[in-house]
């Protein structure tokens, strides 16, 4: 029985579908020299074989090219592609950007025979001029279950039962409409499947145990110009429940917004090898897999095209085609823009807030600064550094784009700065922070570079800097985790004493340029245990001016200086001292830079050291180690606790109170190493909420348990008369005065249970009750 009802339900569904296919509407235009246009069930649902059958049903034939030209001369024009004998054409008299690619005459579309269009028919018995009389019959149709409705130009409708199709494939596919068709309008055209390009971009992704390549599959897909939005946003969402136990990851959502709309978009879908995914997902599936989907929406620019945007939902037809004559032409290729491809794009270059997302699980055992599941980044090369003057202590740098690079094994390759950088923009926001690696080093079981290795690398960098300082390369690191930079204090930023930083929460690209004081001092502090470069937040300006060390520098070729990369927001030193996070947009990689001191002419090399991270925000201990005995002052007066070794081998600058940081210096080697303890993981919010709920439930349970029984030491209340004004076997009228009250009290006391007093009742309370009884008896 169940099977019967099941088949009945399926039969009813199929019947509804079949009934939906039994309705055909044929829109017919006026006849011009016998040629007219027929549209079935909306636009472009007629195949070539069905077109011949349809014209035959109207007692007509497919027109030839000569007949179409004759009808064109009589005033016949449409904005619909239709079949004629051997071609698909649009007759146009007036040029229109959305019809036949702004062409006039009988425009021929080069297409395949499998596409669906409208059709043109020629009736030899029609008048030689224009004829707009209503068509009331389909004379050559035969019997069939289909309801055929003829819709004339004036709105009159005539229906009949029958069929005109002779090919079974046309009957079966009666409702299939080809998407590869349109009226010639770019606002109606969707991208044909044949024009989706698949591009594979190889990118090196070395890991700890293997050096393999992964490919990012970039699908170039076009979006119809009906999308009339001001920006395309790509959201990246990362949910990592494993790292939430360590307080090192949160569910974040970033949005990157280009400034203009576009008709084409580059969708980048990273595809990592299965071999890498196995190491990431073998444990994370127990909680919740990490989701990282990246889509970079940009607008492409084609030379020789013009910008055009049409209103959403605008569908040109014969009634409104004259209203759109003001739209310019998209291309002059001779092929309709809407049929085969979209040749028009918004000719703009958007500024994209390139925010990357480093999705690293604790199962990844190697430092990874560029996860394959993040967007491609662009790099900025700071070249041709021109010094303005020696008195201003400033430099102008010009950013030049260069191809992105991903360098991860920085223990072996220290010749170049190890970071990918995002192109700085004057108006776009670029959030870039430095991923802390204390957790990675702890779990990887891998030691950071030793001071000797850093010293060797620094010597190589010093030599290259002395030889060619204009080609000095500064890169920026663009990553998501801001947990490390939250602990940085302005004392680690390259700003001299007397510099003040402004806290300005705005998207404006114009920020004040840091001007040095009379005796500027600059700190260049680097990290020893960190395998990546130090994150330094600096303000943005069109000409970056910064201070040099200890007085006026000498203008010579051997004096390399470090520049400051731009950022769109700035953080005040006051906020940093309070422990607030520093809003950074770009971070600077300063590894192994060499500077000279004018008084001693000695090269001081900055060795990377590790800030000792404490439990209190804003308290960071950093160590600056140099080769010579120099005096380096703190950048924040009155807010530092600095000490200088008399031997001049190291200098330790401590900001805040040392709660968890302990530093030990090796005076012989000249390098101060700071042992940064492992930071205790932060307690997740959900765990705090759960503990609070449990504590509240426990308190509530205790209160209920206590209230359910008599409390220890609680006295019973004696209610005179019990509120009802009667005493046992006596009426109130019989009792009067003090005797009545005394008898009532005696009665209530005598009605107390004769059992022993409560175990919690004290001896004093028992004595008081006995004295009350004695007084009442007397």
From Swiss-Prot:
Biased composition (Acidic residues): 316-325
Post-translational modification: N-glycosylated.
Pfam families: Xlink
Residues with glycosylation annotation: 27, 59, 102, 113, 123, 183, 368, 425, 529, 545, 603
Stretch list, region Stem: 227-685
Keywords of the record: Cell adhesion, Cell membrane, Cell projection, Disulfide bond, Glycoprotein, Membrane, Phosphoprotein, Proteoglycan, Receptor, Secreted, Signal, Sulfation, Transmembrane, Transmembrane helix
S-S pairs: 30-132, 55-121, 79-99
Residues the record lists as Phosphoserine modifications: 708, 733, 742
Ranges for region Required for interaction with EZR, MSN and RDX and for the co-localization to microvilli: 709-727
Molecular function (Gene Ontology), one example: cargo receptor activity
Chain ranges passing through the membrane: 686-706
Binding site for hyaluronan: 43, 80-81, 107
Domain (Link) ranges: 34-123
Bias kind Low complexity: ranges: 251-270, 427-437
One annotated GO biological process: negative regulation of intrinsic apoptotic signaling pathway in response to DNA damage by p53 class mediator
Sulfotyrosine, modified sites: 410
Topology relative to the membrane: Single-pass type I membrane protein
Region listing for Disordered, in residue ranges: 251-277, 293-338, 351-370, 391-591, 628-678
Modified positions (Phosphothreonine) in chain numbering: 726
Keyword Secreted: yes
Signal peptide residues on this chain, from the entry's feature table: 1-22
Intracellular or extracellular location(s): Cell membrane; Cell projection, Microvillus; Secreted
Extracellular side stretches: 23-685
Purpose of the protein: Cell-surface receptor that plays a role in cell-cell interactions, cell adhesion and migration, helping them to sense and respond to changes in the tissue microenvironment. Participates thereby in a wide variety of cellular functions including the activation, recirculation and homing of T-lymphocytes, hematopoiesis, inflammation and response to bacterial infection.
Subunit-level organization: Interacts with PKN2. Interacts with TIAM1 and TIAM2. Interacts with HA, as well as other glycosaminoglycans, collagen, laminin, and fibronectin via its N-terminal segment. Interacts with UNC119. Interacts with PDPN (via extracellular domain); this interaction is required for PDPN-mediated directional migration and regulation of lamellipodia extension/stabilization during cell spreading and migration. Interacts with RDX, EZR and MSN (via FERM domain). Interacts with EGFR. Interacts with CD74; this complex is essential for the MIF-induced signaling cascade that results in B cell survival.
UniProt protein name: CD44 antigen
């Amino acid at each position: 029985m169940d099977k019967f009802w099941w088949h009945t339900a399926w039969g009813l569904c199929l019947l509804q579908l079949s009934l939906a296919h039994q309705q055909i509407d044929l829109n017919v235009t006026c006849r011009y020299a016998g040629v007219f246009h027929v549209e079935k069930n909306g636009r472009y649902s007629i195949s070539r074989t069905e077109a011949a059958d349809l014209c035959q049903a109207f007692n007509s034939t497919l027109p030839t090219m000569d007949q179409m030209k004759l009808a064109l001369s009589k005033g016949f024009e449409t904005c619909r592609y239709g079949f004629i004998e051997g071609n698909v054409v649009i007759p146009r008299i007036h040029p229109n950007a959305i019809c036949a690619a702004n062409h006039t005459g009988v425009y021929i579309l080069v297409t395949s025979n499998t596409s669906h269009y409208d059709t043109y028919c020629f009736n030899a018995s029609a008048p030689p001029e224009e004829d707009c009389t209503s068509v009331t019959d389909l004379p050559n149709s035969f019997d069939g279950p289909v309801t055929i409705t003829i819709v004339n130009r004036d709105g009159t409708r005539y229906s009949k039962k029958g069929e005109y199709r002779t090919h079974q494939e046309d009957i079966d596919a009666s409702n299939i409409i080809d998407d590869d068709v349109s009226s010639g309008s770019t606002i109606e055209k969707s991208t044909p499947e044949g024009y989706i390009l698949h591009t594979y971009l190889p990118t090196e992704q070395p890991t700890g145990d293997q050096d393999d390549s992964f490919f990012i599959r970039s699908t170039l897909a076009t979006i119809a110009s009906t999308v009339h939005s001001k920006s395309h946003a790509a959201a990246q969402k990362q949910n990592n429940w494993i790292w939430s136990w360590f307080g090192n990851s949160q569910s974040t959502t970033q949005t990157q917004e280009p400034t203009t709309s576009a008709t084409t978009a580059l969708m980048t879908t990273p595809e990592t090898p299965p071999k890498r995914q196995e190491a990431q997902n073998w444990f994370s599936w127990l909680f919740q897999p990490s989701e990282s989907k990246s889509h970079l929406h940009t607008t492409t620019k084609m030379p020789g095209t013009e910008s055009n945007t049409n209103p959403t939902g605008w569908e040109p037809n014969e009634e409104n085609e004259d209203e759109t004559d003001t739209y310019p032409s998209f291309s002059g290729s001779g092929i309709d823009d809407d049929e085969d491809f979209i040749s028009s794009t918004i000719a703009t270059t958007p500024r994209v807030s390139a925010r990357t997302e480093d999705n690293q699980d604790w199962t990844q055992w190697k430092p990874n600064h560029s996860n394959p599941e993040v967007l491609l980044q662009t790099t900025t090369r700071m070249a041709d550094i021109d010094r303005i003057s020696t008195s201003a202590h400033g430099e102008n740098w010009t950013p030049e784009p260069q191809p992105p690079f991903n360098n991860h094994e920085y223990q072996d390759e220290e010749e170049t700065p190890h970071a990918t950088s995002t192109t700085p923009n004057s108006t776009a926001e670029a959030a870039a922070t430095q991923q802390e690696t204390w957790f990675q080093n702890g779990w990887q079981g891998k030691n950071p570079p030793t001071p000797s290795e850093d010293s060797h690398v620094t010597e190589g960098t010093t030599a290259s800097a002395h030889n060619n300082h204009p080609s000095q390369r500064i890169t920026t690191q663009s990553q998501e985790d801001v947990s490390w930079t939250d602990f940085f204090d302005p004392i680690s930023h390259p700003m001299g004493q007397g510099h003040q930083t402004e806290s300005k929460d705005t998207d404006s690209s114009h920020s004040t340029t840091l001007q040095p004081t009379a005796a500027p001092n600059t700190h260049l502090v680097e990290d020893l245990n960190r395998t990546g470069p130090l994150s330094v937040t600096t303000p943005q300006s069109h000409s970056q001016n910064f201070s040099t060390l200890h007085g006026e520098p000498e203008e010579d070729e051997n004096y390399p200086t470090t520049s400051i990369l731009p950022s769109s927001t700035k953080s005040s030193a006051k906020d940093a001292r309070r422990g607030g996070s520093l809003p950074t947009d770009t971070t600077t990689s300063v590894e192994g830079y060499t500077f000279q001191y004018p008084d001693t002419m000695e090269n001081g090399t900055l060795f990377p050291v590790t800030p000792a991270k404490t439990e209190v925000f804003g308290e960071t201990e950093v160590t600056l180690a140099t080769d010579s005995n120099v005096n380096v002052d703190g950048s924040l007066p009155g807010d530092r606790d600095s000490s200088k070794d008399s031997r001049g081998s190291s200098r330790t600058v401590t900001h805040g109170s040392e709660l968890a940081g302990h530093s030990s210096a090796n005076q012989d080697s000249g390098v101060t190493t700071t042992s940064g303890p492992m930071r205790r993981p932060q307690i997740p919010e959900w765990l705090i909420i759960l503990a609070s709920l449990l504590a509240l439930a426990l308190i509530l349970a205790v209160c209920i348990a206590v209230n359910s029984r008599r409390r220890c030491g609680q006295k019973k209340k004696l209610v005179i008369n019990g509120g009802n004004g009667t005493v046992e076997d006596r009426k109130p009228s019989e009792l009067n005065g003090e005797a009545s009250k005394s008898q009532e009290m005696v009665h209530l006391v005598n009605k107390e249970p004769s059992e022993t007093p409560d175990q919690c009742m004290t001896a004093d309370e028992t004595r008081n009750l006995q004295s009350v009884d004695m007084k009442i008896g007397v």
